[in-house]
């Protein structure tokens, strides 16, 4: 590798830190989801963009939320979504969505590449998965290329409604 290859290589992923995050994700998920050990896991995020218009001043503010997403195949494929924080110090209550009870589930390509699930007619879940994101203040620090691909395949083949 030449000098330019070393200069423009980009950040390296700390695999030990990533493995620690995966263990924390598993512990949190298993603590709040019944039979959590049966699920495969992927870290994800959700975003909420709000626009404002104050006369001459226009803009938007985006807030991000970290998620632990579990999925399991079987006779009734299920997705479980657990809200958490980027450092994985705690989590909220899970939203468990068996395929048989979901109103609609699809992958939205535009404006964001998100997996959208309508567990009922009142609200929806927007799940954005990633291989690795550098900003550990906003996102869970985890290297998860194979897990992301596995979730994408599961969603497309077993879970999506359209």
Tell me the role of every PLM-derived stretch.
Residues 1, 42-43, 79, 104:
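Residue-level detector of intrinsically disordered, flexible termini
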Residues 2-72:
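Anionic N-terminal interaction surfaces
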Residues 3-6, 16, 132-162:
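Terminal and domain-flanking low-complexity segments
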Residues 25, 29-33, 106, 155-162:
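Hydrophobic, Leu/Ile/Phe/Ala-enriched alpha-helical segments that form helix-helix packing faces
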């Amino acid at each position: 590798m030449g000098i330019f290859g070393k200069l423009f290589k980009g950040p390296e992923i700390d695999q030990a830190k990533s493995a620690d995050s995966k263990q924390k994700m598993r512990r949190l998920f298993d603590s709040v989801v019944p039979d959590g050990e049966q699920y495969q896991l992927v870290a994800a995020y959700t975003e909420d963009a709000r626009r404002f218009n104050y006369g001459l001043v226009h803009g938007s503010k985006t807030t991000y939320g970290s998620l632990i997403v579990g999925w399991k195949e079987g006779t009734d494929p299920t997705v479980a979504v657990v809200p958490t924080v980027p450092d994985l110090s705690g989590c909220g209550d899970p939203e468990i969505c068996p395929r048989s009870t979901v109103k609609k589930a699809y992958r939205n390509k535009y404006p964001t590449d998100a997996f959208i699930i309508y567990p009922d007619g009142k609200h929806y879940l927007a799940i954005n998965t990633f291989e690795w994101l550098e900003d550990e203040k906003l996102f869970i620090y985890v290297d998860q290329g194979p897990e992301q691909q596995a979730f994408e395949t599961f969603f497309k083949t077993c879970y999506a409604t359209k």
